């Protein structure tokens, strides 16, 4: 049975919400068996396309990957990130968000920002588009924030994040991502906000957690401090590639067990090549 936003909200304070990113059909199919929520994140720009940041990710890219992920799911809620500069007015936000939902079949969109995007969030929610909020460290704002740094370390920054989170919730977001903030602030917001908080680098005080799946699986040697690598796929893949190349070079692959047997037509062709033509 497909989870919906009410199912996610009902888990607040009762059951931790497990979320991961996915960008492809095969990965989404695996995640769907176990995760409550799958985010088609704009982190696809860095993890799949090798971009320096998320700022170059386009709406078409998000829709293409959203389609692939939705095709694979049978249970998890699927949320698609709205890319940079795709929601700077309520009307533009609705135009692009409605396209994402209609073309991918996803359940909701995610917007980065607090007070500055509250109007856009309210505009979408009022028109039937569920929204996931995102405050704290916001990758689309990294130039303004001075890089990818922990947020909320000063009193003014802490207050700003609290105002952002409150504005997002009041605008109608069904849950909110808290990224790279202190454990005490995450705990305070989780207690105060009426909707689930999903942490990424924000401690286990949050109602749920999310990670970039490539980081969690150890597919890169570079990853943030807050990531726990539950596998080491980078070395597993390297070992597999080395083994494959060695087997090819030594003519060990393909073996007889990997080849097809001759059918009647081929046997005739080999015995009487001119007659088989």
From Swiss-Prot:
Sequence positions that bind Mg(2+): 42, 81, 112
Active-site residue list: 179
Cofactor annotation remark: Binds 1 Mg(2+) ion per subunit.
Source species, domain of life: Bacteria
Database matches in SUPFAM superfamilies: Phosphoenolpyruvate/pyruvate domain (SSF51621)
E.C. no: 2.1.2.11
Residues that coordinate or bind 3-methyl-2-oxobutanoate: 42-43, 81, 110
Family matches, as InterPro entries: Pantoate_hydroxy_MeTrfase (IPR003700), Pyrv/PenolPyrv_kinase-like_dom (IPR015813), Pyrv_kinase-like_dom_sf (IPR040442)
GO biological process terms held by the UniProt record: pantothenate biosynthetic process
Reaction(s) catalysed by this chain's protein: 3-methyl-2-oxobutanoate + (6R)-5,10-methylene-5,6,7,8-tetrahydrofolate + H2O = 2-dehydropantoate + (6S)-5,6,7,8-tetrahydrofolate
Pathway: Cofactor biosynthesis; (R)-pantothenate biosynthesis; (R)-pantoate from 3-methyl-2-oxobutanoate: step 1/2
Main localization category: cytoplasm
Gene Ontology CC: cytoplasm
Keywords attached to this entry: Cytoplasm, Magnesium, Metal-binding, Pantothenate biosynthesis, Transferase
Entry-linked CDD domains: KPHMT-like (cd06557)
Molecular-function GO terms, alphabetical: 3-methyl-2-oxobutanoate hydroxymethyltransferase activity; magnesium ion binding
Cofactor: Mg(2+)
Compartments where located: Cytoplasm
Similarity comment: Belongs to the PanB family.
Quaternary structure, from the entry: Homodecamer; pentamer of dimers.
Its biological purpose: Catalyzes the reversible reaction in which hydroxymethyl group from 5,10-methylenetetrahydrofolate is transferred onto alpha-ketoisovalerate to form ketopantoate.
NCBIfam families the UniProt entry points to: panB (TIGR00222), PRK00311.1 (NF001452)
Protein name: 3-methyl-2-oxobutanoate hydroxymethyltransferase
Source species of the chain: Anaplasma marginale (strain Florida)
